[in-house]
């Protein structure tokens, strides 16, 4: 099911036009419905990180779980830091752990802390597809990683044959959002055994607006 750029732009334009004005900037999301895929077979499920060419159009919340050099590098960039001691405190409260997992879009963690993170937070971060980006404890500059994460979306195909992904905000141009959608589609199609022939339909919508089909 090949998609023409102009048809994507047209659907984005319509989705934005049909969205009622809200007192906040709405996100734009894409839903990719798949067919002829057996999700009982683990090899057909996947997790992906897609770098959007035009970014997400809004701030991304990043927390760094670290001590020492990595924590210092994070503070220089104004990022929230969770120390190993704080990690153990959070682990003692499931409510706090869930709140933490919900609050941030991405986590960065120094490698030596990963066993603790897996033990204490894995059950909260794993299902949300938010396990940390792992860095060496000697890293002194997080800028390249942070800049990449600001443009990254994590998507996964798990139990249902549909993949959802944020692709921008209503304030972005139709063309920018369309290019972001193309990046997501190409990444998903690249993971499918029979490529685009397994794409059943694609819809785009704003947070509160109706879904608009992208005609193939």
Swiss-Prot record:
Keywords: Repressor, Ribonucleoprotein, Ribosomal protein, RNA-binding, rRNA-binding, Translation regulation, tRNA-binding. GO terms for molecular function: rRNA binding; structural constituent of ribosome; tRNA binding. Disulfide bonds: none annotated. InterPro entries: Ribosomal_uL1, Ribosomal_uL1-like, Ribosomal_uL1/biogenesis, Ribosomal_uL1_3-a/b-sand, Ribosomal_uL1_arc, Ribosomal_uL1_CS. Gene3D superfamilies: 3.30.190.20, 3.40.50.790. GO terms for biological process: regulation of translation; translation. Coiled coil: none annotated. Pfam families: Ribosomal_L1. One of its GO terms (cellular component) is large ribosomal subunit. The keyword tRNA-binding applies. Part of the 50S ribosomal subunit. Belongs to the universal ribosomal protein uL1 family. NCBIfam families: PRK04203.1. Binds directly to 23S rRNA. Probably involved in E site tRNA release. This is Large ribosomal subunit protein uL1. The gene is rpl1.
């Amino acid at each position: 099911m090949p998609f023409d750029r102009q048809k994507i732009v047209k659907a984005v334009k319509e989705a934005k036009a049909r969205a009622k004005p809200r007192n906040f900037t709405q996100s734009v999301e894409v839903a990719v419905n798949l067919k002829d895929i057996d999700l009982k077979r683990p090899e057909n499920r996947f997790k992906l990180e897609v770098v959007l060419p035009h970014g997400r159009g809004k701030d991304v919340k990043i927390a760094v779980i670290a001590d020492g050099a990595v924590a210092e590098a994070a503070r220089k960039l104004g990022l929230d830091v969770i120390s190993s001691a704080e990690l153990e405190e959070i682990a003692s409260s499931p409510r706090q752990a869930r709140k933490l997992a919900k609050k941030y879009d991405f986590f960065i963690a120094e490698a030596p802390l990963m066993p603790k993170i897996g033990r204490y937070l894995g059950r909260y971060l794993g299902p949300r597809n938010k396990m940390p980006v792992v860095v060496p404890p000697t890293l002194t500059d997080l800028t390249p990683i942070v800049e990449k994460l600001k443009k990254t979306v994590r998507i996964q195909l798990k139990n249902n044959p549909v993949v959802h992904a944020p692709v921008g905000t209503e304030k972005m141009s139709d063309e920018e959002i369309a290019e972001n959608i193309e990046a997501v589609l190409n990444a998903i199609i690249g993971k499918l055994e029979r490529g685009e022939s397994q794409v059943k339909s694609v819809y785009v919508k704003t947070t509160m607006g109706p879904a608009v089909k992208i005609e193939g």
